[in-house]
Amino acid sequence: MAFTDRLLDAWYKGHPALALLRPLEGLYRRVVERKRARFLAGEGDIYRAPVPVIVVGNITVGGTGKTPLILWMIEHCRRRGLRVGVVSRGYGAKPPSLPWRVLPDQSASEAGDEPLLIVQRCGVPLMIDPDRSRAVQALLAAEPLDLILSDDGLQHYRLARDLELVLIDAARGLGNRRCLPAGPLREPVERLSSVDALLYNGAMADRGDGYAFRLKPSALINLRSGERQPVDYFPAGQALHAVAGIGNPRRFFNTLEGLHWRPVPHAFADHAVYSAEALTFTPALPLVMTEKDAVKCRAFAADDWWYLAVDAVPSDAFVGWFDQQLLRLSP
């Protein structure tokens, strides 16, 4: 087991050695609390966009289903006649310059895997830059927009925001509820009391403190041909290689098992860089990966490589609440 996997396991299942990291946790907490206090006091260089900004993020390390929910939000806003743009840090991207407009024919190494996925799926105007304030300004200079979605950036306080949504994995929760490096939290758990809404990925129903949403498999898509098949394309009991380089690979493997297949799991680091050699497994079986991984593998994909497209399905209560917020934010 890799070091990062062991650390995640300790954060979410407990380990006595984490007590040794509490002095560092104390230092980390003071830094992030001071940073937020400066934002609340209006100190520093804070940019407020001329259009509403909605931040979709989390306070935990690891995946929470953020990209599928952002895709849902883009389409939902478009159906209401809103022109939407997205800004992202572009983790792992190496663009020629910053800020950088992501286009569907770019490579994942240039644009970042998640931004490229979003643009290829729905063609939204999207700008990457670690400085999200600069990304928003560049995007507004390039496109007439009514609304900006910030992919992550909850802790990027230089960008003023009108709405904060925080996603939590319902199965893993907040782990030991401690901050880095003694736990998985980017900010103290008390931060959740100040956000506008919590969304629990995988929850069976809305909770007293937040809304439920789930990820619904929608299709199997061939990496080479683009052929689209229903999720029952493989028969029950089909053995296949399952590749996931996401924040929580186990969730993807569980999804495949829920479709009654027998996945041979191959977990990679989040934002992993792939090669044909790295994805050559024995025995020879069909290979199914996440859509986020697929954007990095099309150039060398084999004929029997597929990705599982998933769609976010939020609860009716969240949809109603979100529509109210859009009305409130509309000019």
Swiss-Prot record:
GO CC annotation: plasma membrane
Functional pathway: Glycolipid biosynthesis; lipid IV(A) biosynthesis; lipid IV(A) from (3R)-3-hydroxytetradecanoyl-[acyl-carrier-protein] and UDP-N-acetyl-alpha-D-glucosamine: step 6/6
Keyword Transmembrane helix: no
Species name: Pseudomonas syringae pv. syringae (strain B728a)
Domain of life: Bacteria
InterPro entries membership: LpxK, P-loop_NTPase
Designated name of the protein: Tetraacyldisaccharide 4'-kinase
Kinase among keywords: yes
Gene field: lpxK
Protein family membership: Belongs to the LpxK family.
Example GO molecular function: ATP binding
EC number: 2.7.1.130
Catalyses which reaction(s): a lipid A disaccharide + ATP = a lipid IVA + ADP + H(+)
Function (record text): Transfers the gamma-phosphate of ATP to the 4'-position of a tetraacyldisaccharide 1-phosphate intermediate (termed DS-1-P) to form tetraacyldisaccharide 1,4'-bis-phosphate (lipid IVA).
GO biological process: lipid A biosynthetic process; lipopolysaccharide core region biosynthetic process
Record key words, sorted: ATP-binding, Kinase, Lipid A biosynthesis, Lipid biosynthesis, Lipid metabolism, Nucleotide-binding, Transferase
